[in-house]
Amino acid sequence: KQPHMAPKDKILFYKYLDKASVYFEYGSGGSTYVASLKPNLKQIYSVESDLKFLNTLNKLIEDGTKGMSVTPTLSWLYIELGTKYGDWGQPHKNCPEHQKISYSSQLGNLKKTEREKIDLILIDGRFRAASCLKCFQYIKDDCVIMFDDFLNRTQCYGVVLDYYDIIEKTEDNRLVVLKKKPNIQKIPLEIIKKYELEKS
């Protein structure tokens, strides 16, 4: 019922979660549970590829929020990747490419009016580099992106620093807080396509 994060990173995540109003996450879990208890949040969008895990977590959230007068609206965005239960959302080896690409495209599938209200995004699922790169064209300049396991995997994810600035991190050296670089209009499509099938 807690996010799977390093201790100081967890504190940093809670700091931004407490200030948000509409929260979007790639990869559900303890972060979703904690967010569902936050009265400041109006809406949660959660992308998940493990249906059994999603259903188990949804039941925990329903039980945990019983009796609360104000809770966020939770919208599940389920993507079929042939994932085995408890395998961190890993796509099956026979999963079609279009389904893998669909995972990182979920924020773009929301209505413009919905996207514009999002002020906090957590990247903590699969296809992380592509998910972060695809967010760029849709989010407001003041939207915050929190990217877990970034600093210990910069060889996988470092490309995002061509388009985002790190505005905060902790000595745990994993989670980073990102905002869009102010002088960039869009990310070239060929850069995004290069990372769409990178499942890490």
Each model region followed by its residue ranges:
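Internal catalytic-core helix/loop-beta-alpha segment
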Residues: 74-134
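C-terminal substrate-binding/active-site "lid" region of AdoMet-derived donor-dependent transferases
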Residues: 110-200
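Generic detector of well-ordered alpha-helical segments enriched in charged/polar residues
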Residues: 14, 54, 58, 104, ...
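SAM cofactor-binding core of SAM-dependent methyltransferases
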Residues: 4-87
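N-terminal donor/sugar-recognition subdomains of glycan-related enzymes
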Residues: 1-13, 92-99, 184-200
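A short linear-motif detector with a strong N-terminal bias
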Residues: 2-4, 22-25, 124-125, 156-157
